[in-house]
Amino acid sequence: GGGSLFAYAFTFLAALAVTFILTPAVKNFAVQIGAVDKPDARKVHHGLVPRLGGLAIYAGFMVSVILTVGFTYEMTGIMIGATCLVFVGIADDIVSLPAKVKLLGQILSAAVLVIFFDVNIDWIDLPYMGIIEFPLFISVPLTIFWIIGFINTVNLIDGLDGLAAGIATIASIAIAFLAFQMGQWISAAAMVAMTGACLGFLQYNFNPAKIFMGDTGSMFLGYVIAAVSVMGSMKTAAAAVLIVPLVALAVPITDTVLAIVRRRQSGVPIFSPDKNHLHHRLLAAGLSQKQVVLVMYALTAFFSAAALLVVRLNPFLGVAVILLTLGVFIFWAKKLGVMREVVLPPTEKDEK
């Protein structure tokens, strides 16, 4: 099929409806099997909230993509890899997997796509530099790293009601818009489906949340956004397709990088939870949970718009705007105390 507006509307509504209808059922299921979120050091939540909501997002996305795109070679790879990752997420939401096991699951899920379905960043056409080709021994690890980076970035911001789902929605719209403009209807349809699924879920996940997406959801979102952008980059090799998701998620990516630097400096494990992420610092600065989420949405929308301007209009101007904004952003993040020393909170194991 082509990319008629009717087709996109159907893709969007199918994902939205399936996720919206299934979320209450997933919620009951999560409660029954004990996949509930207990408040801990990183959480700002009180009381038990069911996890696993990502299952409903996954279902909405899959049903919509299968109905509209079908099983094209690359999309099949993305769906298989995402399904592997969803199983890792479910296990993690039920029993809390060790960080190393989770990382291994992420690597394998990415490898399925990159190795068996050849979805990788094998060449890129950079403005002013021309075409750069990567040999397999670079493109395969590079693409796996790219996917894992997005998985963990979205995973990291899933700390406040509606935060990850809303940010993923905005980023998905930006990627869909670019793909649509470049005539890549499969990438566009996939991101439109993701937008619908996230919005269907947000109805239940916005503050005060009745359900969390859990790692099932956040890892799935990161995976699909990363994988679809790689799939798109293979068609055109324009750097644009990779720049948009990077810049759209500039805030959480910067937050992730700062978190890793902060933890290395403090000598604690990279994946250990702490409360120094930007959203925690904004809460500490006196904003309500809802206000913090809206500030993060606004930042994401701003960066997404900037990214689209960059790649459609003037690369130099856009890059300047983005670097300037990032500079201001990092300055404020430091001022808010994002880089403070990490003091590890007592873990659940210590309390038992």
Task: Please report, for each region that a protein language model flagged, where it lies by residue.
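Transmembrane alpha-helix boundary signature
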Residues: 63-73, 91-97, 114-129
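Membrane interface segments of multi-pass transport proteins and intramembrane proteases
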Residues: 30, 34-35, 93-98, 124-134, ...
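Membrane-interfacial loop-to-helix junctions in multi-pass transporters
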Residues: 133-143, 188
